[in-house]
């Protein structure tokens, strides 16, 4: 069997399972009144496509089999345009025209923005402009932010199950937790002496910490739902 085909099949299986777990976890938490799960899947997948395509093709020049497994297999199965189309059609047919239009607008704008941000961050990393953020204390700080976000998401899901706050209040709590993680990360970078030179590095630190907070908070929520 062609090695690239095997790599694509393996990556595709992992991507499909990841999409199933993440989207179902989000739908179980937020409900199915709006396609939150598919939107998150496509936006996060677009970011990873932009970031990893630059890193794997332009910077490290990995073998075709590795690129095929990740970019074609995993991300191809993880993201889903067909589900986005079906969910949007369902919203139109049930008369939720505003939700359908909002889903189209958010999906197009956020996915394009995410793939651009991912590609730009990867290119800046390649020329060393964000090296200070992931070297020395910066790496430990971002690692701690990821761990704290995971624990916060897990604890929040358990608290939500007991308190019964409702989707709106739960969303506000998660936005507040995300803000705390981002602010705490930036403060820790400054306190430990990590040099943020120029607007791009400051913006890069904000983007990385916000992305890490959202991803690991969501992962904690999904894990807690699965454990429950």
UniProtKB/Swiss-Prot annotation:
TM regions (residue ranges): 3-23, 37-57, 72-92, 101-121, 141-161, 172-192, 202-222
Signal peptide region: none
Keywords, in A-Z order: Cell inner membrane, Cell membrane, Ion channel, Ion transport, Membrane, Metal-binding, Sodium, Transmembrane, Transmembrane helix, Transport
Keyword hit for Cytoplasm: no
Catalysed reactions listed for this entry: fluoride(in) = fluoride(out)
InterPro entries, A to Z: FluC
Regulation: Na(+) is not transported, but it plays an essential structural role and its presence is essential for fluoride channel function.
Cellular component GO terms, alphabetical: plasma membrane
Localisation per UniProt entry: Cell inner membrane
Ligand binding (Na(+)): 76, 79
Highest taxon listed in the record's lineage: Bacteria
Cysteines paired by S-S bonds: none
HAMAP family for the chain: FluC
Function: Fluoride-specific ion channel. Important for reducing fluoride concentration in the cell, thus reducing its toxicity.
Similarity annotation: Belongs to the fluoride channel Fluc/FEX (TC 1.A.43) family.
Protein name as annotated: Fluoride-specific ion channel FluC
Organism, scientific name: Methylococcus capsulatus (strain ATCC 33009 / NCIMB 11132 / Bath)
């Amino acid at each position: 069997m062609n090695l690239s085909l095997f790599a694509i099949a393996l990556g595709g299986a992992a991507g499909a399972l990841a999409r199933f777990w993440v989207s179902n976890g989000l739908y179980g938490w937020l409900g199915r009144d709006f396609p939150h799960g598919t939107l998150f899947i496509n936006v996060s997948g677009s970011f990873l496509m932009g970031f990893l395509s630059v890193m794997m093709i332009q910077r490290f020049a990995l073998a075709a089999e590795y690129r095929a497994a990740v970019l074609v297999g995993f991300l191809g199965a993880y993201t889903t345009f067909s589900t986005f189309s079906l969910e949007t059609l369902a919203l139109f047919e049930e008369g939720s025209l505003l939700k359908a239009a909002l889903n189209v607008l958010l999906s197009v704008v956020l996915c394009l923005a995410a793939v651009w941000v991912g590609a730009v961050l990867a290119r800046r990393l390649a020329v060393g402009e964000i090296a200070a953020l992931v070297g020395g204390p910066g790496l430990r700080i971002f690692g701690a932010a990821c761990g704290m976000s995971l624990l916060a998401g897990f604890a929040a899901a358990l608290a939500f199950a007991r308190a019964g706050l409702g989707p709106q209040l739960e969303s506000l709590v998660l936005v507040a937790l995300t803000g705390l993680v981002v602010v705490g990360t930036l403060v820790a970078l400054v306190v430990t002496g990590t040099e943020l030179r120029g607007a791009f590095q400051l913006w890069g630190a904000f983007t990385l910490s916000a992305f890490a907070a959202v991803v690991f908070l969501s992962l904690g929520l999904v894990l807690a739902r699965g454990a429950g």
